[in-house]
Amino acid sequence: MKSQYKKEYFVKNLRKVIRGENLKREEAFNCLKFLLDHEFGIANDSCFGAFFAAIQTKTPTIEEITGLMDVVLNYDRKPLIVERKFSEPLCGIIGSGKDDVKTFNISSISSIVGAAAGGKIIKNGSRSEASVAGTTDVFEELGLDVEMKDKIKFEKALNTYGFGFCDVAPYFPKMLKEYMGKFFFVHPLSYILPIASGVKFDRVVFGLASNATEKTAELLLRLGYDNSLVVAGHDKNGKNFDEISNIGKLKYLK
């Protein structure tokens, strides 16, 4: 598809969304792919923001979000294939971020506790965008080599201690360039993007800073994660945070 046709295709679908119409999975895929390929030059950031804001305003559908995640997981992702020397399932402990309470990165500590208790844990993440501290920030402060790209050392840590940290940046190069650090509002990928990991896990504990647990659970099923726990915590004032709450209401879905 030539560049001019890509622009016309994108504008046509953006107008559909602005009118309140839903996109098909393939249409959502193509639009995000064009954005990640930087097809619109200096206007790319504006197009990206308009596209995400328009979809979020009308309420994103499962088809649309799945199409967007197809780009992230199947087009942009450069997977890290590791050799496991254990039979237990590999669990990802992840959070959506963008919560209202502004806690420190609790899920990072939870992942260490999970591994210490005998679980096999992958913790993926990035630097903070809206929270007090991102996963990468926390582990860097604890002395971990967050930029380690040595596959053998990663495998040794995972097989010896049952824990591996995976900063997302090296494994999603196009997302790193066109997306990271630019979106501070809830958008269509907020419901599911944290499953994007260099190392694919078998099970998921997903902390969500909204009440859309059913939507996230259905998206996890669509993307092949059929053994997952989605949790949405609240504080005593009803504010959302992406953790299991012991200070207010907790909504969860398995």
What residues fall within each predicted segment?
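Acidic, glycine/proline-rich low-complexity segments that act as flexible tails and inter-domain linkers
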Residues: 1-102, 117, 240
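Glycine-rich anion-binding loops and their surrounding alpha/beta cores
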Residues: 2-16, 23, 74-77, 81-82, ...
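Catalytic-loop motifs flanking and including active-site residues across diverse enzymes
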Residues: 47, 106-110, 212
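Short beta-strands and strand-loop turn motifs
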Residues: 48-50, 93, 123, 167-168, ...
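A generic, well-ordered mixed alpha/beta core segment in the N-terminal half of proteins
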Residues: 92-157
